């Protein structure tokens, strides 16, 4: 089966995470997610419900379980297929999250009360349409940080309000790249159609570091003992098991990769796009241009997502530059960076070299993203997000002292981006 005789380590691709921050503060060591009640998330609705229709929207409180587990529990309770359930976003497992789901129940009564230790139905109301991914205004977070000195409250309070004025760097966090932080590498290998290299990275031991306890299963792969290797991977390791099953049946490397669900391959392609975005953002943070325009930028309108070019002549014109600054200060617009693909509009002038540098950072060229068959097709993403309703206070409960930070973020934004700025990356995520 081996279509590549070499098992030598592949080209080393740098970290996909941002290496610079806006606040550049000295680290504050603390711990989050010691228990679900330390990480509260409340979904903010995008629209009002009408009160009638085939879809029952339910308010759910989810405690310490994964999104797929939530969907299965609700589907079984209501006697429907998981496909009949809609949701706006996926919430962190290690949290108490309040969110909406929709359940297609035409001509049927509303769901009865749910008696489950991890899922509670808070309310029900009917609507004509299914809830779709992205149909939320944002999320409200309340996070308790433990093992931290309460004396740091003034600094945290000051930094939170600075972030509310400047915006938060809109970085993709670790969860975007998988537990080995190699999702972008797998995406790159898909772009290059390096099928054997992809399998070596996913299943072997010559690429990105992996947990010590995975050595046996990865060595078994290198011995071409694919059927035996399957037994080492858990049922939840869907991609690994699918590829190994295909290999055990004599599939080529390409066929084994294509045996993996398209949704999983899309995840890795999105991770590649995210790594490129983070690299552009990193350069802008380093140059102190993350929250203002440079020549050739594409301005992103937060209401609606439209973009327009910011030319050198606009920045040189005092009146136009002042208007841009007013709109920036009001969080109406922000600079943007590409989620690279054939459908994306690229920057120009001073902005384009930064975007090309980011593509080179993952050892690719712009040409790789011009293929019309490339998916996802690409878009622009703002370099910053608005943080509203900031709060910081010290507290104590039966588990000891804590610092509580709270804030609202728009949809698609990560609370980890805020924590990274506030604590300088020294926060410890327990149970993650």
Where do the protein language model's features map onto the residues?
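Ser/Thr-Pro-rich, acidic low-complexity intrinsically disordered regions of eukaryotic RNA-binding
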Residues: 67-72, 415, 419
